[in-house]
């Protein structure tokens, strides 16, 4: 519903916008979320409505875009464990059925549906308690839309994700 404030509510829960009123409870406990870092520490992830402006680094690789939120898991001292990063990237390329010639492909060169799959996979890699999807099939073709919904349904059935529609 355009103009209903749906995206603003989602962004407030994720700490991108200040909330004007109310409290956020997670697993029965009140949590304070003033930034995306606070949200992520509480296991909340957001796939934004506009992936190109708010979600992706279009000139960067599929690998970079897949792992940027979990990069700290691959750091050993001052080095990045590239093999572990490639392994996680491939895991989510496979899980999301992303079509890409390589992990090093610039994400801006992929179709909208494959860009969206990488973005959803990025946030799934954080193992969130709550995954907020703001219009996850916006700007993708019918085939990709169907694939994204099938993946979401599979995640719900396996118990990895709880899904709520906000409208």
Question: What are these regions, as identified by a protein language model?
Answer:
Residues 2-167:
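Glycine-rich phosphate-binding loops of nucleotide-dependent enzymes
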């Amino acid at each position: 519903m355009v103009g209903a404030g749906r995206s603003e509510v989602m962004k407030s829960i994720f700490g991108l916008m200040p909330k004007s009123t109310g409290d956020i409870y997670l697993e029965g406990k009140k949590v304070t979320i003033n930034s995306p870092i606070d949200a992520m520490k509480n296991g909340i992830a957001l796939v934004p409505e506009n992936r190109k402006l708010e979600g992706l680094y279009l000139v960067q690789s599929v690998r970079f875009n897949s792992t940027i939120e979990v990069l700290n898991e691959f750091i050993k001292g001052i080095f990045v464990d590239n093999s572990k990063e490639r392994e996680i990237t491939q895991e989510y390329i496979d899980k999301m059925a992303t079509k890409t010639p390589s992990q090093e492909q610039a994400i801006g060169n992929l179709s909208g549906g494959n860009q969206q799959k990488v973005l959803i996979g990025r946030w799934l890699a954080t193992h969130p308690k709550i995954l907020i999807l703001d219009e996850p099939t916006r700007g993708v073709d019918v085939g990709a839309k169907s694939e994204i919904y099938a993946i979401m349904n599979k995640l719900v059935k396996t118990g990895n994700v709880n899904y709520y529609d906000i409208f």
